[in-house]
Amino acid sequence: MPKIKTNRGAAKRFKKTGTGKIKRSHAFTSHILTSKTRKRKRQLRSSAVVAAVDHKNIAKLIPYM
């Protein structure tokens, strides 16, 4: 049986942690930053964990990570 292809867009956006969770970055950080507060921009820099409801679908996109 052939290997499953990794979705290259997903591979650039997500990373797996040591415990198997999937990390993601926040949106709304690329432009129109003057209207956002310093606190909001600082919090958006940190990474987040993918919600449990989305985990299964994203894991299918990155099978070998």
From Swiss-Prot:
InterPro entries: Ribosomal_bL35 (IPR001706), Ribosomal_bL35-like (IPR021137), Ribosomal_bL35_CS (IPR018265), Ribosomal_bL35_sf (IPR037229). Belongs to the bacterial ribosomal protein bL35 family. PANTHER family: 54S RIBOSOMAL PROTEIN BL35M, LARGE RIBOSOMAL SUBUNIT PROTEIN BL35M. It comes from Geobacter sulfurreducens (strain ATCC 51573 / DSM 12127 / PCA). NCBIfam families: rpmI_bact. One of its GO terms (cellular component) is cytosolic large ribosomal subunit. One of its GO terms (molecular function) is structural constituent of ribosome. This is Large ribosomal subunit protein bL35. GO terms for biological process: translation. Residues 1-45 are annotated as: Disordered. The keyword Ribosomal protein applies. Residues 10-26 have a biased composition (Basic residues). Keywords: Ribonucleoprotein, Ribosomal protein.
